Amino acid sequence: MNRSLMRLFGLMAVALTVHANTFYVTIAGLGGEPDYEQRFALLASETEKTLKTHAPDASIETFKGPDATRANIRAALGRIAAAAKPQDAVVILLIGHGTFEGDYKFNLPGPDLSAQELAELLNKIPATRQLVVNTTSASGGGNEALRKANRILISATKTGSEKNATVFARFWVEALGDPSADTDKNGSVSAMEAFRFAERKTKSFYEEQKRLSTEHAVIEDSPKGGAAGQLAMNFPVLRLNAETAAADPAKRVLQAKRDQVETQIDQLKYQKSLLAPELYRTQLSKLLLELARVQEELDK
């Protein structure tokens, strides 16, 4: 299919969904350590800000810290089930840690949320277009339970055995606010476009760090599994606001600085076993403060 046809189909998909509502639910789960808690919460906050900028009329719910409980998630999805119509769309973003021991679980304060339970909650929502973006460790382990017709699945890892902390979330969130992710220039970032953006950035991260990649993201839109196709390409995750889509040089500098600090934190954690505990804590604290400062500037 040539690029002009792909762009036409993309524009048609956006046009068809103008009068439908999109329900966004972003959850930053349990970090386990202060640095993860802070970074997960920052990513959730950044996502919320981007969504409110580009989709002010959408239904947006964000859970982080002590509010990211299984009970609150169940209640939020219950509200969506009561309000959504078949033509609507649902976008679920999971940020944090996951585990897989025969079944996948998303780590939360209090009881965890299993992939099977999440699937059951989503199955009650009448919206026929659904996207689940699971950026946690071991996230691929939940795909089998979550598969359903018209549901797009994106996971940071291919299987449940990839259990290390992931960086995919950072680049997925970045894709939502970066006009360059809209490769067909139709005014929206599709699930496929955001996935390819984040996948490419994740691969580059490990190459630049000269580290073996411990995460291999996948996207699928068939109940039988396998590679994604037209459904993912024509699912607009976010329509870009024309007034704010133009690149801001000052923001680009801050985003580059944030990425640099994030990378320094990752490098420090990678070298943790080689450092004295007090030195590690001091350096980590310094970097986390810098990350918070940069994010505060970005949020202005």
List where the protein language model places each region.
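Positively charged n-region of N-terminal signal peptides that target proteins for export
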Residues: 1-7
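Bacterial N-terminal signal peptides
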Residues: 7-19
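Cysteine endopeptidase catalytic domains of the caspase/legumain-like
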Residues: 19-300
